[in-house]
Amino acid sequence: MSPAEASREENVYMAKLAEQAERYEEMVEFMEKVAKTTDVGELTVEERNLLSVAYKNVIGARRASWRIISSIEQKEESRGNEAYVASIKEYRSRIETELSKICDGILKLLDSHLVPSATAAESKVFYLKMKGDYHRYLAEFKSGAERKEAAENTLVAYKSAQDIALADLPTTHPIRLGLALNFSVFYYEILNSPDRACNLAKQAFDDAIAELDTLGEESYKDSTLIMQLLRDNLTLWTSDNAEDGGDEIKEAAKPEGEGH
């Protein structure tokens, strides 16, 4: 085993260790080292999933914080507590700085290493979907021209992923389904296009249902889970009380159908 291979193996092991300890920032660092190894070529499915899980947890914690703080900010604004609102805005902007930094980190890695080195259709869709996801996370909190740019970048990445997925991946493939799930969430939440969101989600669900009997045992669980999430969102979006925003919109959470 060459020194590079040994160090790659060690970083993967350390990333798994960090995951067990729920130290996701360090998990990101270990997996970035693996991804940046010059002669690495394409990441294995396991490595790709570890990288995805690491970033998912790091960004997920901040996204949850941002939503909570934004909700409190709205309540205080409606009560007219201007002094509190100013403090909340400042605190929210600190979280937004962290969110921007995390998104910029993975987007740079995707552009410099992961997307260019991807050869298999599955890998290309996985990374382009990931690229769309992190641009979408930027669009969630940016405003004005920055939000417009983030939304445009999201659309381009998801469309590129979709073109490959429709041509080369089975309708029941967890990554293809995860892409449809997150792409539809983007249409609904960021572009405010409920019709397009519903059409995309329904098409993906119906196409997969038609081919369900061809599913292998290993991906059956992943695929049916994402199909359930597609259906949950469709139910939420088409119901009369969709406007109340009481229920949480579902996104792909597992790396095989990665996203969220």
Swiss-Prot record:
Transmembrane segments: none annotated. Gene3D superfamilies: 14-3-3 domain (1.20.190.20). Residues 241-260 are annotated as: Disordered. It is found in: Cytoplasm; Nucleus. GO terms for cellular component: cytoplasm; nucleus. Residues 247-260 have a biased composition (Basic and acidic residues). Keywords: Cytoplasm, Nucleus. This is 14-3-3-like protein GF14-F. The gene is GF14F. Pfam families: 14-3-3. Expressed in seedlings, roots and panicles and at lower levels in flag leaves and internodes. PROSITE patterns: 1433_1 (PS00796), 1433_2 (PS00797). Belongs to the 14-3-3 family. The keyword Cytoplasm applies. Is associated with a DNA binding complex that binds to the G box, a well-characterized cis-acting DNA regulatory element found in plant genes. InterPro entries: 14-3-3 (IPR000308), 14-3-3_CS (IPR023409), 14-3-3_dom_sf (IPR036815), 14-3-3_domain (IPR023410). May form a complex with the transcriptional activator VP1 and the bZIP transcription factor EMBP1. It comes from Oryza sativa subsp. japonica. Induction: By wounding, drought and salt stresses, benzothiadiazole (BTH), ethephon, methyl jasmonate (MeJa), hydrogen peroxide, abscisic acid (ABA) and incompatible and compatible races of rice blast fungus (M.grisea). Its main location: cytoplasm.
